């Protein structure tokens, strides 16, 4: 452990101050999860973040961990594919959007719609990741992107699907968000065909691999998995650890995406096809 800390300090000294938040490597910076949840509610009292009008069968695109610094080639590939697919209804980025201080506008520009290049101006939903908190990044995120906790609907003739974005950027939902999630699912889940959870930090990797954010405590993960099973959650989409894993626990599918950032060994994204028969995952390697 001491050797790891010394190595991290050497890395920090060797890097530009705009590329590495030394304080953020060892302790969370900015607001904690309780404050972020409270501020998300101030932005949207009921935490609803709109809806998408779609067909009974539709698709959406997902990527994670772009870690935008100087380049964003892979994210551009994702954006072009997603915005030229007329069968898609929306996109999702599962967090760790940036790696450089104040780089969020570059990230958002990389995901923008261009009428010269794209046929579809689809909406993109963003999840907060631990790297997005570095350099007190929550200030920019909430201003330029919006809340870290929210839900939205995909509405079609005769029904609708539910999508919930959770804030796990510091390795826990916290007390207030957990209480809200339990109540929200209890009161609302039965009104939807499918329910999909969007989160940055995954629930299965227990090693403290990501410095200040860590990973979810096992006890919290087990409680959430029980909650999702009881409320018939169809799919939990996760990122954070830069590798792909796809498994089922308690009849709930948990899918961890590999990173899409330009230096990833095997960058990828996911197209999810949704219908009354369920959700089909179509992996796309870049």
Residue ranges and their predicted role:
Residues 282-286:
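Short, solvent-exposed aromatic-acidic interface loops
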Residues 188-208:
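Short acidic, glycine-rich surface-loop motifs adjacent to enzyme active sites
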Residues 15-16:
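C-terminal motif of bacterial Sec signal peptides marking the signal peptidase cleavage site
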Residues 65, 95-96, 129-130, 200, ...:
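Active-site glycine-centered loops adjacent to acidic/histidine catalytic or metal-binding residues
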Residues 27-48, 52, 103-194, 214, ...:
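Extended active-site neighborhood of metal-dependent phosphoesterases/phosphodiesterases
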Residues 60, 91, 163, 195-196:
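Hydrophobic beta-strand anchors of alpha/beta hydrolase catalytic cores
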Residues 2-8:
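Sec-dependent signal peptide recognition
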Residues 19-105:
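N-terminal active-site segment of His-dependent metallophosphoesterases
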């Amino acid at each position: 452990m001491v050797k790891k800390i010394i190595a991290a300090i050497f890395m920090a000294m060797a890097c530009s101050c705009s590329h590495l938040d030394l304080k953020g490597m060892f302790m969370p910076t900015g607001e904690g999860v309780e404050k972020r949840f409270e501020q998300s509610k101030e932005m949207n009292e009921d935490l609803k973040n709109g809806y998408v009008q779609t067909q009974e069968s539709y698709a959406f695109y997902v990527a994670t961990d772009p870690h935008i610094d100087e380049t964003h080639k892979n994210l551009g590939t994702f954006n072009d594919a997603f915005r030229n697919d007329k069968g898609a209804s929306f996109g999702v980025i599962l967090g760790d959007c940036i790696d450089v201080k104040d780089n969020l506008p570059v990230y958002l520009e990389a995901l923008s719609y261009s009428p010269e290049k794209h046929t579809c101006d689809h909406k993109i939903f963003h999840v907060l990741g631990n790297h997005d908190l570095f350099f007190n990044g929550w200030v920019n995120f909430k201003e330029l992107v919006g809340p870290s906790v929210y839900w939205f609907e995909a509405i079609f003739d005769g029904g609708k699907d539910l999508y919930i974005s959770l804030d796990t950027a510091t390795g826990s939902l916290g007390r207030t968000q957990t209480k809200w999630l339990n109540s929200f699912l209890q009161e609302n889940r039965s009104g939807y065909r499918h329910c999909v959870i969007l989160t940055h930090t995954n629930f299965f990797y227990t090693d403290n691999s990501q410095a200040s954010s860590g990973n979810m405590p096992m006890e919290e993960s087990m409680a959430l998995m029980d909650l999702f099973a009881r409320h018939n959650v169809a799919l939990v989409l996760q990122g954070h650890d830069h590798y792909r894993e796809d498994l089922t626990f308690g009849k709930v599918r948990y899918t961890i995406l590999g990173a899409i950032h330009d230096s990833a060994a095997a960058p990828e994204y996911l197209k999810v096809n949704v219908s009354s028969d369920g959700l089909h995952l179509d992996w796309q390697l870049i």
